[in-house]
């Protein structure tokens, strides 16, 4: 657990749990806010296990998540990362779920996003170390997961998705407002950069243009309309 320069009593609360479970929790603290990418890398450096799992605040890992992800990685050594569908919920309860491609190939990077749900993923620590962890660069803020998947595949590794939802992600009105214009521009850049890493043929870059137009268009439509489209997309379990 790492406190990234919080201004409230977050660290004190975390310290209580650290003192209660000293053999289970490693507590870190940044002197100032360093951002998610840097903080994730700091946690990776402190981690000693064979596998790395993560989750986001306010979300819920279902009881069998770790068991099923560890079992998959142990019994399918050809895969470096595993993820799963997520159930979406807000203050009114469950309202949708994400869809997945079970065995994403490089060409799927052109048609399906996200390739793996970051919050519910589990990955081999050795692969994290080999690809250099998360890229600490302003161009990859809020899109660190997408950049990570490109790096994993560029190093010759593969990932897989289980078909059973193992995670519940809070996705409410506040979540809709979080994605800024800067984050959307970063989202366009990370795809372009990833295609270069994977040495995609020139005609695949038409997807980069298409993705850029779509992402920037989302900045122009009213929030209420975007919320409607967003929820309609996930209610059917389609990305």
Predicted regions and their residues:
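Conserved donor NDP-sugar-binding/catalytic core segment of glycosyltransferases
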Residues: 64-96
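Short aromatic/hydrophobic "clamp" motif used to bind/position activated sugar donors
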Residues: 52
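Conserved nucleotide-sugar donor-binding catalytic segment
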Residues: 45, 104-182, 187-190
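The conserved acidic donor/metal-binding loop of glycosyltransferases
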Residues: 56-60, 85
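A conserved acidic beta->alpha catalytic loop
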Residues: 3-12, 32, 56
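Acidic helix N-cap motif at the loop->helix transition within catalytic regions
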Residues: 8-17, 60, 64
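Glycine-rich, basic loop-to-helix element that forms the pyrophosphate-binding segment
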Residues: 30-47, 68
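Non-catalytic, C-terminal membrane-associated alpha-helical segments of glycosyltransferases
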Residues: 175-239
């Amino acid at each position: 657990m790492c406190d990234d320069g919080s201004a409230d009593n977050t660290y004190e609360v975390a310290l209580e749990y650290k003192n209660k479970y000293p053999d289970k929790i490693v507590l870190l603290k940044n002197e100032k806010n360093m951002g998610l990418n840097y903080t994730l890398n700091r946690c990776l450096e402190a981690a000693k296990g064979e596998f790395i799992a993560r989750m986001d605040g306010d979300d819920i890992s279902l009881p069998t998540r770790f068991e099923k992800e560890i079992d998959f990685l142990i019994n399918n050594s050809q895969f470096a990362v595993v993820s799963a569908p997520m159930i979406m919920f807000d203050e009114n309860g469950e309202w949708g779920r994400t869809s997945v491609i079970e065995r994403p190939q490089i060409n799927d990077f052109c048609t399906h996003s996200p390739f793996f749900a970051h919050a519910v993923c589990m990955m081999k620590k050795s692969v994290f170390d080999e690809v250099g962890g998360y890229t600490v660069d302003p161009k990859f803020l809020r899109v660190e997961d997408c950049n990570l998947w490109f790096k994993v595949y560029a190093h010759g590794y593969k990932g897989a998705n289980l078909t059973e939802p193992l995670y519940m992600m809070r996705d409410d009105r506040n979540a809709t407002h979080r994605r800024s214009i800067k984050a959307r521009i970063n989202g366009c850049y990370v795809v372009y950069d990833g295609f270069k890493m994977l040495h995609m043929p020139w005609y695949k870059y038409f997807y980069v243009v298409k993705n850029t137009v779509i992402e920037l268009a989302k900045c122009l439509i009213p929030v209420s309309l975007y919320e409607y489209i967003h929820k309609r997309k996930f209610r059917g379990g389609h990305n």
